[in-house]
């Protein structure tokens, strides 16, 4: 299949593809406020302390495992119909626990949710690459990061509000995916293509995909390290009230959409320069958090780190997409989504291990900062080396 260059799409199409990827945020954060209630409701089930956290994280694991398959299906079968079908099934599987009373059946429904999330995330991003180019593509990809961050705050609040009606309440929100599916159906068209045999995996630019995937794993690990650990470190500064912890965490999270908006103004810069500066800024944030004298300074450091992430993620996404031909773009984006999900999983392993070795989570931050700074310096070195090399 080949696509004509310069496919025209406007604001309506961009918006229709901007909202569905919030499903990945929805999949995790909606249930965070009701996790204690679920543990109580299934307290007679052996291993419930293990099973309930698995309910929250299982969709993320499915994204890591199935995103490359989702990309392959998108390349072979087309993007739009597969996306709409995944969104419809996502709504059904997401709301299913409202009618289920067996935790293992709920676990099964969460697997379906995760597979659908892999399809939705991969195909929406791929379609943005298909339908937009140049600055428009960069801005819509940056907007995905910003909207996902803002939606995280919304879904946490909605989860807590509906959780007052019982642990099943938040599952109702999964039905919001259906109006989004209708918008995709009405507004988005499959990109024009000429049918021919779809090339194999070898058609992917292997070196480029490997480099962007490894860098994305590192970036996602840093991003989620801040997101996950802000609320766990704040009690060390005497902030123990859940409402205040939520407020402080929300302030830090605002940094991500701010960074994504800044990306709009710098997106045309050399990617090596951007990555160098962004990883260096992330290192500054971790140093600031490690040496913060009080909660306000700690949150200021976290805000800087989230802003760096808001710059870093769309940089990586546009870089990953830059060399992908239409015929393999789905698989390339699937591998990128998989790498991002692996980074999320890695953050839950790396930080506790470093905390054990250093004595606390905060004491581990300088080591993380050093790693981030090293990646940034390597990126800048590659930039300067290319500029100093003789033509």
Q: Which positions does each model-derived feature cover?
A:
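Helix-loop-helix hairpin linking two adjacent transmembrane segments in secondary transporters
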Residues: 134-135, 143-188
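Helix-to-loop junctions at the C-terminal end of transmembrane segments
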Residues: 66-78, 258-271
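Extracellular/periplasmic helix-loop-helix junction of adjacent transmembrane segments
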Residues: 34-64
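Cytoplasmic helix-loop-helix junction between adjacent transmembrane helices
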Residues: 103, 109-148
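Extracytoplasmic
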Residues: 12-43, 226-231
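Conserved MFS/SLC helix-loop-helix module at the cytosolic interface between two early adjacent transmembrane helices
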Residues: 64-102
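Paired small-residue
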Residues: 89, 93-96, 104-112, 296-304
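A late C-terminal transmembrane helix in Major Facilitator Superfamily
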Residues: 323-359
């Amino acid at each position: 299949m080949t696509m004509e260059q310069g496919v025209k799409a406007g604001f309506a199409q961009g918006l229709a593809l901007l909202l569905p990827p919030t499903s990945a945020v929805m999949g995790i954060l909606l249930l965070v406020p009701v996790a204690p209630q679920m543990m109580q409701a299934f307290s007679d089930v052996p291993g419930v302390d293990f099973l309930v956290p698995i309910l929250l994280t299982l969709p993320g694991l499915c994204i890591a495992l199935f995103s490359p398959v989702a990309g392959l299906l998108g390349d072979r079968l087309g993007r739009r119909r597969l996306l709409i079908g995944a969104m419809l099934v996502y709504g059904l599987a997401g709301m299913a626990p409202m009618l289920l009373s067996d935790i293992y059946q709920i676990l099964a429904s969460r697997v379906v949710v995760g597979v659908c999330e892999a399809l939705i995330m991969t195909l929406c991003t791929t379609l943005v690459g298909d339908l937009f180019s140049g600055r428009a593509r960069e801005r819509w990809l940056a907007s995905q990061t910003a909207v996902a961050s803002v939606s995280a705050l919304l879904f946490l609040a909605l989860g807590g509000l509906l959780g007052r009606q019982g642990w099943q309440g938040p599952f109702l929100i999964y039905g919001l995916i259906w109006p989004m599916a209708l918008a995709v159906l009405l507004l988005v068209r499959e990109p024009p293509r000429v049918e021919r045999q779809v090339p194999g995996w070898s058609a992917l630019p292997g070196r480029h995909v490997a480099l962007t995937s490894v860098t994305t794993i590192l970036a996602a690990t840093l991003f989620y390290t801040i997101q996950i650990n802000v609320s766990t470190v704040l009690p060390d500064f005497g902030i123990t009230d859940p409402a205040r912890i939520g407020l402080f965490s929300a302030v830090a999270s605002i940094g991500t959409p701010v960074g994504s908006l800044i990306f709009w103004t710098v997106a045309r810069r050399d990617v090596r320069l951007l990555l160098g500066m962004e990883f260096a800024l992330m290192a500054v944030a971790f140093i600031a958090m490690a040496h913060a004298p009080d909660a306000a300074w700690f949150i200021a450091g976290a805000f800087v780190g989230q802003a760096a992430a808001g710059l870093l993620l769309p940089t990586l996404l546009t870089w990953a997409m830059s060399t992908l031909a239409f015929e393999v773009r789905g698989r390339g984006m699937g591998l990128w989504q998989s790498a991002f999900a692996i980074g999320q999983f890695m953050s839950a392993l790396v930080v506790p291990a470093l905390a054990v070795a250093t004595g606390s989570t905060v004491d581990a931050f300088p080591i993380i900062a050093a790693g981030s700074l090293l990646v940034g310096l390597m990126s800048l070195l590659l930039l300067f080396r290319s500029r100093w090399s003789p033509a």
